[in-house]
Amino acid sequence: MNLPNFIIGGGVATGTSFLSHAIRDHSEIYLPKVMRPECGFFYKSWEYSKGLEYYSNKWFADAGEQKTKGERSSLYLHGDFLRVAERIHKHIPNIKLIFCLRNPTERAYANYRFSVLSGYEKFSFEKALSREDKRFAQAKGWKKEIQPNLYRRRGLYDVQLRPFLDFFPKENIHLIKSESLSANTELEIKKLFDFLGVEFQNYNLAQKFTSYSVKSRILQTQLRKFYGEKLTKVTENARQVSYENSIADKIVNWNLLNEKIPMTDSVRSHLNEYYAESNQFVSKITGWDLTDWA
């Protein structure tokens, strides 16, 4: 049975897509082809219940003789309430884990903006934060696990890293500061290749697209109901080219706003204070200078 020996496990809106794209074509590395939604086998109970053989067949059937095999599931880091670390350790105790950690205040806002663009969020950022705990507790169905409106909690890296540090040795966990991945890409890729035990090779750089907002959050939620999972692809096409195959597609294009609406100073101050203790934990275990996170 083909199983991974490394996982890029998150977090959401921290650069994991950029990272996996960068290393995908390395001759000694196998990553499954990009699929939406992401794998999330150890996070989603309805996937995990299908068993390890299903996981192997769906995601690693095409793996060849590469030295190392892996997968990317951005939600794993945030699965402390679902015992994700315990699940992974039960089946692949020697796995190598890679986590990207971004300024949690910026990460929360990026996560919110993605949920808005995906049609999962009708509230302003401030209102969504004020309702987060209630929504988390009352979520039902697939939302009970996926939690598309969980923004603030996902930046508590101390809470989310501790289960992995409890189950896995520190040498099996590689943490990447997202800001360094962006500013010092080659250095961070070299360190990652060393961690994986593969030689340095040229890497891919993902194309960067404009960070879109929407004119109407309510309209975007209605477009989600109309398109379902296809909305993500339709929106991506609209970001890259003039893509209008139907009246609905024209509405998608009309609702996209080619700019990033900034976070308010009051919300930023609230989040910086909220994350202060967690950031100290990250700085302590990594030695990183996190003055740019304050």
Report the location of each language-model feature.
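PAPS-dependent sulfotransferase catalytic core
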Residues: M1-L77, H91-I95, P104-G141, F168
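Generic structural signal for small/hydrophobic residues in well-ordered secondary structure
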Residues: G15-T16, G70, I88, L97, ...
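Acidic-and-aromatic substrate-binding clefts and catalytic sites of carbohydrate-active enzymes
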Residues: K44-K50, Y76-L82, R152, S180-N184
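Short aromatic-enriched loop/helix-cap "lid" or pocket-rim segments at secondary-structure transitions
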Residues: L82, A108-R113, G119-Y120, L187-I189, ...
